[in-house]
Curated annotation (Swiss-Prot):
<dbReference type="InterPro" id="IPR012340">
    <property type="entry name" value="NA-bd_OB-fold"/>
</dbReference>
<keyword id="KW-0408">Iron</keyword>
<dbReference type="Pfam" id="PF05958">
    <property type="entry name" value="tRNA_U5-meth_tr"/>
</dbReference>
<comment type="similarity">
    <text>Belongs to the class I-like SAM-binding methyltransferase superfamily. RNA M5U methyltransferase family. RlmD subfamily.</text>
</comment>
<dbReference type="GO" id="GO:0070475">
    <property type="term" value="P:rRNA base methylation"/>
</dbReference>
<feature type="binding site">
    <location>
        <position position="87"/>
    </location>
    <ligand>
        <name>[4Fe-4S] cluster</name>
    </ligand>
</feature>
<feature type="binding site">
    <location>
        <position position="363"/>
    </location>
    <ligand>
        <name>S-adenosyl-L-methionine</name>
    </ligand>
</feature>
<keyword id="KW-0489">Methyltransferase</keyword>
<feature type="binding site">
    <location>
        <position position="294"/>
    </location>
    <ligand>
        <name>S-adenosyl-L-methionine</name>
    </ligand>
</feature>
<feature type="binding site">
    <location>
        <position position="81"/>
    </location>
    <ligand>
        <name>[4Fe-4S] cluster</name>
    </ligand>
</feature>
<keyword id="KW-0479">Metal-binding</keyword>
<feature type="binding site">
    <location>
        <position position="90"/>
    </location>
    <ligand>
        <name>[4Fe-4S] cluster</name>
    </ligand>
</feature>
<dbReference type="GO" id="GO:0005506">
    <property type="term" value="F:iron ion binding"/>
</dbReference>
<feature type="active site" description="Nucleophile">
    <location>
        <position position="389"/>
    </location>
</feature>
<feature type="binding site">
    <location>
        <position position="342"/>
    </location>
    <ligand>
        <name>S-adenosyl-L-methionine</name>
    </ligand>
</feature>
<keyword id="KW-0411">Iron-sulfur</keyword>
<dbReference type="GO" id="GO:0003723">
    <property type="term" value="F:RNA binding"/>
</dbReference>
Length: 433
C-alpha cells in the first residue's frame, strides 16, 4: 500500500561570514574571496571588512549582503542622495569618484587586454540633461507617485531630489509633481521626460487618455510660468507641440537640432570632450574622406565635416538621417552627406563608398557592430575610432580588427555616467604599415 507524506519545505540557513574586500567591480560591488570562490557584495569597498550573509551560492562565484560593516575605506563617501540604496539609478555614490574611475578603467583594461590611456570625464554631479520619471496613481491615498524604479523592481521610488540631474531639472521636480498631481487625468499618466537643451528646458508628458480642456490649460500655464517647451504624447507615435520651437544643443561650435524623443548623449560635458578627442585621435586632415557609421543625427559627423574634405554619415533610422541633413544645412556644411542603410548589409558596395575612406568612426548601440567589422576592414582606413556603450561587444568586435592587422593605439574610459555601473569607452585603432 502506497504511503503519502506531506512535503517538507526545504530550509536553507544563510551563512554569516567575515570577509575582507580587495576590489570593486565596474558595477560598484565589493569583491572578496571566500573558500577559493569570488564573492560579490553590494555596498562594500576595497579595504573594508564586514560580516556578510551569503544570498546566492553558485559553482564559480557567490553573492552576499552586508550584515555589519567592521571598517571603513578611506575612499568611502557619504551619498548625496537620500534615495541612494533604494532607487535603481545610482550604484556607487558611496565610493569616491577616483575609485569609481579606477575600477571601471581596470575592468575595461581586463576586457580589452590593453592599458587605459586616459579617463575622459567632466563634473560628477548635476550632469544629466535628460531624465524620464515614471508616474503612478495610488487610489488609496489619491496621490501621484513620480520617480525612478527601485533596484531590481518595477516599484517606483518617489523622488524628491536627484543630485545627478542638471540643476535646472532637479529644481523642477517638486513643481512638476505638484502640477501633474493636480490634473484630473492623473490616473492616466505614464511618464514625464525632462530635457535640458541649450535652447531651454523641455517637458514631454506621456498620457494614456485624452486630456480635458482644464488639464491642458493647467499644463500650458505651468509651461509658461516655468519657461518650458511643452510636448504631449498620447501614444508612442504622436508628439504634439503645445509650446516651444525645435530644441537644439551646442556641440563643438555647432548647433544641433533634435526632436524631443531623439537620442542625445545625456552628459553634455563628456560628449563635448569625447567628440573633440575623437577628432584629435583620427588626426583629420583637409584632404581626408571620413565615414561615420551609426551616425545618428550627426553628433560626430558634423564636427568631422568642419575639418575633412568630405564626410559620409550612415544611419539605420530614416528620421535621424533626415535630422542629420537638416543640421548640416543649418550649419552651412556642404561637404557632408547622410544615407539611410541597413548596416547589416555590405555598405562597401554602395556608390558613395567606391572611392574608399581614409578614416572611419563608429558609435553603435549596445549590441555592437559585429555585422560591419568586415566591411570596415575592406575599406582599409588608416585609423578607426570605435565609441562603445558596452565593453563586452567592444572586446568582441575588436578581435576582427586586431586579426586584420590593426593595433590599439589609444583606449579611453568615458565617465559618461558617474555613480552608476555604466561603462562607456572609446578606442583608436591604427593600421600596421
Amino acid at each position: 500500500m502506497a504511503q503519502f507524506y506531506s512535503a517538507k519545505r526545504r530550509t536553507t540557513t544563510r551563512q554569516i561570514i567575515t570577509v575582507s574586500v580587495n576590489d570593486l567591480d565596474s558595477f560598484g560591488q565589493g569583491v572578496a574571496r571566500h573558500n577559493g570562490k569570488t564573492l560579490f557584495i553590494p555596498g562594500l569597498l576595497p579595504q573594508e571588512n564586514a560580516e556578510v550573509a551569503v544570498t546566492e551560492d553558485k559553482k564559480q562565484y557567490a553573492r552576499a549582503k552586508v550584515v555589519r560593516r567592521l571598517s571603513d575605506s578611506p575612499e568611502r563617501e557619504t551619498p548625496r542622495c537620500p534615495h541612494f540604496g533604494v532607487c535603481g539609478g545610482c550604484q556607487q555614490q558611496h565610493a569616491s569618484v577616483d575609485l569609481q574611475q579606477r575600477s571601471k578603467s581596470a575592468a575595461l583594461a581586463r576586457l580589452m587586454k590593453h592599458d587605459v590611456s586616459e579617463v575622459i570625464a567632466d563634473v560628477p554631479w548635476g550632469y544629466r540633461r535628460r531624465a524620464r520619471l515614471s508616474l503612478n496613481y495610488l487610489p488609496k491615498t489619491q496621490q501621484l507617485q513620480m520617480g525612478f524604479r527601485k533596484a531590481g523592481s518595477s516599484d517606483i521610488v518617489d523622488v524628491k531630489q536627484c543630485p545627478i540631474l542638471a540643476p535646472q531639472l532637479e529644481a523642477l521636480l517638486p513643481k512638476v509633481r505638484a502640477c501633474l498631481g493636480s490634473l484630473q487625468a492623473m490616473r492616466h499618466l505614464g511618464h514625464v521626460e525632462l530635457v535640458q537643451a541649450t535652447s531651454g528646458t523641455l517637458m514631454i508628458l506621456r498620457h494614456t487618455a485624452s486630456l480635458s480642456s482644464a488639464d491642458r490649460e493647467k499644463l500650458e500655464r505651468f509651461s509658461h510660468s516655468e519657461g518650458l517647451d511643452l510636448y504631449l504624447a498620447p501614444d508612442s507615435e504622436i508628439l504634439e507641440t503645445v509650446s516651444g520651437e525645435m530644441p537644439w544643443y551646442d556641440s563643438n561650435g555647432l548647433r544641433l537640432t533634435f526632436s524631443p524623443r531623439d537620442f542625445i548623449q545625456v552628459n553634455a560635458g563628456v560628449n563635448q570632450k569625447m567628440v573633440a578627442r575623437a577628432l584629435e585621435w583620427l588626426d583629420v586632415q583637409p584632404e581626408d574622406r571620413v565615414l561615420d557609421l551609426f551616425c545618428g543625427m550627426g553628433n560626430f559627423t558634423l564636427p568631422l565635416a568642419t575639418q575633412a574634405a568630405s564626410v559620409v554619415g550612415v544611419e539605420g533610422v530614416p528620421a535621424l538621417v533626415e535630422k542629420g541633413q537638416q543640421n548640416a544645412r543649418l550649419n552651412g556644411l556642404q561637404n557632408v552627406t547622410f544615407y539611410h542603410e541597413n548596416l547589416e548589409e555590405d555598405v562597401t558596395k554602395q556608390p558613395w563608398a567606391k572611392n574608399g575612406f581614409d578614416k572611419v568612426l563608429l558609435d553603435p548601440a549596445r549590441a555592437g557592430a559585429a555585422g560591419v567589422m568586415q566591411q570596415i576592414i575592406k575599406l582599409e582606413p588608416i585609423r578607426i575610432v570605435y565609441v562603445s556603450c558596452n565593453p563586452a561587444t567592444l572586446a568582441r568586435d575588436s578581435e576582427a580588427l586586431l586579426k586584420a592587422g590593426y593595433t590599439i593605439a589609444r583606449l579611453a574610459m568615458l565617465d559618461m555616467f558617474p555613480h552608476t555601473g555604466h561603462l562607456e569607452s572609446m578606442v583608436l585603432f591604427s593600421r600596421v604599415k
